[in-house]
Design a protein with these regions (language model features):
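Glycine-rich phosphate-binding loops that contact phosphosugars or nucleotide phosphates
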Residues: 74-211, 220-224
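A short, well-structured juxtamembrane/interface segment
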Residues: 51-66
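Short, amphipathic alpha-helical interaction segments embedded in low-complexity terminal/linker regions
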Residues: 220-305
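Cofactor-/ligand-binding subdomain signature composed of acidic, glycine-rich
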Residues: 2-48, 52
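Gly-rich Lys/Arg/Thr-decorated short loops/hinges at beta-loop-alpha junctions or inter-strand turns
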Residues: 37-45, 105-116, 228, 269
Length: 305
């Protein structure tokens, strides 16, 4: 994909392809000089993301509204952007106890592209339409297109297809005037400036994307009730570390002892929500479970808070 576009009769280079003056002599720098420079440049990332908080919050509101109607959150990207989407999607089930079908990561080139470059995969809009057709996207879904450049054909094809299906479309790109930013209903465009290594958007642009994805998924899941206070009340307890974390969460939320937390977890069949209600209200596991069902799974309501 060409990195030049015309403006006032002249060709203008995309922001993500411009050279960073501070790193012009990068190949002459010592190790300490390189990492110092990278650290200074990285400090620009959270500031750029902060400028986009209103757009990020609007995106969360839209995603939450649709997920409450049975929709899904779907990330689409290629290369680094696609991998970041797959990573964030894969972390949601163990963190929030949700089905893997609710947050999906779609990457150009398929599973192999997560660990290996797949030549030409990002250059086809048709491939994106094919991949998304298999997901049966509808009006209650939200699709987040991830592309630092904002010009990746695969992502543009995904956005166009999702729009036709009535889904909410969100762009995350480092180029504000890019085709992707213009195509999506909500554009999140952190301007992190040129990279230390020219065009290597796995650096600042990738870091900004990761921060945005953290916010989108975490804020969405919290709004949907998958946290109590700031505790992961629905985490999946698949190993010893997570089982111990569940115990600590219960103790932290209730002020109870280790033995009391362990007993409540056993009696609730390791259901953190039920165990929390038991200890907070001093009731049996069956009564706590019924209270949770009566509150339609709303933990605060079941606790009477």
């Amino acid at each position: 994909m060409p990195s030049l576009k015309k403006r006032n009769g002249r060709k203008e280079m995309r922001r993500t392809e411009q050279r960073n003056r501070a790193s012009k002599n990068l190949d002459h720098m010592s190790s300490r000089e390189i990492v110092d420079l990278m650290s200074r440049e990285d400090q620009k990332v959270p500031l750029a993301v902060a400028d986009e908080l209103p757009a990020i919050a609007r995106a969360v509101d839209g995603i939450v509204e649709r997920m409450r109607k049975g929709g899904r959150l779907i990330y689409v990207g290629a290369g680094t952007s696609g991998r970041l989407g797959v990573l964030d999607a894969s972390e949601c089930p163990p963190t929030f106890g949700i089905s893997p079908q609710l947050v999906r990561g779609v990457i150009a080139g398929g599973r192999r592209a997560v660990t290996h470059p797949v030549e030409g995969a990002e250059d086809s809009q048709t491939n994106a339409r094919h991949d998304l057709k298999n997901l049966r996207i509808g009006k209650n879904d939200s699709l987040v297109g991830l592309a630092a450049s904002g010009t990746t054909p695969y992502v543009l094809g995904g956005i166009a297809f999702a729009k036709r299906q009535g889904a909410l479309t969100i762009a995350v790109t480092a180029n504000r005037k890019s085709p992707l930013a213009k195509a999506a209903k909500i554009a999140i465009t952190p301007d992190v400036g040129p990279e230390v290594l020219t065009g290597s958007t796995r650096l600042k642009a990738g870091t900004a994307q990761k921060m945005v994805l953290n916010m989108l998924s975490t804020a969405t899941m919290v709004r949907l009730g998958h946290a109590y206070e700031n505790l992961m009340i629905d985490l999946t307890k698949t190993n010893r570390k997570l089982r111990n974390r569940a115990k600590r969460i219960l103790m932290e939320a209730t002020g109870k002892s280790v033995s009391e937390a362990e007993q409540a977890l056993r009696q609730s069949q390791h259901n953190l929500r039920v165990a929390l209600i038991m200890l907070k209200r001093g009731i049996s596991a069956d009564t706590a479970r019924k209270a949770l069902e009566k509150a339609d799974g709303d933990l605060r309501r079941a606790l009477g808070e």
